C-alpha cells in the first residue's frame, strides 16, 4: 500500500483540482496489497477443474473459466459458497438466466482477474484477487491531497463497472454520472 500512496501522490497531485473524483483501479490496489499470484504457483484441486468447465467463455475475459482462477475463487469465497453458487447457476440457466453464479458467489468471486494478453507484464501471467478494504484505501488516498476531492476504487471492464470503495459513502454511480 505504501508504494501505491507514493505513486498516486506523485503523479496525480499536479492534475487534481477541487471537486475532482480520482478513479483508482482495483487491480493496482490488489497488486500493491500482495493479492496477485503467479498462475504457475496456483495448484488447482479437482473441483476447480470440474467447475471451471461449466463457466461460459466470453470474449470479455477468462473470469473463472480456467482451473487456476476457479481455485482462487474456492479459496477466497469458500468451497460451500462456490458450490452453492454453481448449483443455483445450473438451475437458473435452464430458465435462460445468466450471471446468477456471480450474484450468489459475491463480489470476491466477481473481482478475480485471470491472465490476459492485454494485461501489463508480468501480471499477464497472474491471478489477481479483488482488493481488501477498498473503502479504507480510498480514504487513505484522499488524505494525501490538500484538495476537496473524492477517491473511488473501481472495477471496470467490458461488461460494466462497480464502485468497490469510496472516500465518500454518499458517492454512488448515479451521483457520479451527474458530473
Give the ranges of each region predicted by the language model:
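N-terminal and secondary-structure boundary signal
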Residues: 1-179
Amino acid at each position: 500500500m505504501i508504494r501505491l500512496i507514493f505513486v498516486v501522490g506523485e503523479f496525480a497531485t499536479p492534475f487534481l483540482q477541487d471537486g475532482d473524483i480520482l478513479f483508482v483501479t482495483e487491480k493496482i490496489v490488489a497488486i500493491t496489497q500482495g493479492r496477485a499470484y503467479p498462475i504457475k504457483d496456483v495448484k488447482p484441486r479437482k473441483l476447480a477443474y470440474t467447475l471451471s468447465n461449466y463457466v461460459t467463455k466470453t470474449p470479455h475475459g477468462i473470469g473463472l473459466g480456467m482451473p487456476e482462477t476457479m481455485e482462487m475463487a474456492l479459496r477466497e469465497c469458500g468451497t460451500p459458497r462456490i458450490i452453492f453458487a454453481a448449483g443455483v447457476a445450473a438451475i437458473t440457466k435452464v430458465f435462460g438466466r445468466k450471471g446468477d453464479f456471480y450474484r450468489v458467489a459475491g463480489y470476491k468471486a466477481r473481482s478475480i482477474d485471470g491472465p490476459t494478453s492485454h494485461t501489463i507484464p508480468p501480471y499477464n501471467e497472474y491471478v489477481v484477487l479483488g482488493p481488501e478494504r477498498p473503502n479504507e484505501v480510498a480514504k487513505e488516498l484522499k488524505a494525501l491531497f490538500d484538495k476537496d476531492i473524492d477517491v473511488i476504487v473501481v472495477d471496470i471492464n467490458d461488461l460494466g463497472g462497480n464502485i468497490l470503495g469510496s472516500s465518500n459513502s454518499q458517492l454512488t454511480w448515479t451521483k457520479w454520472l451527474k458530473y
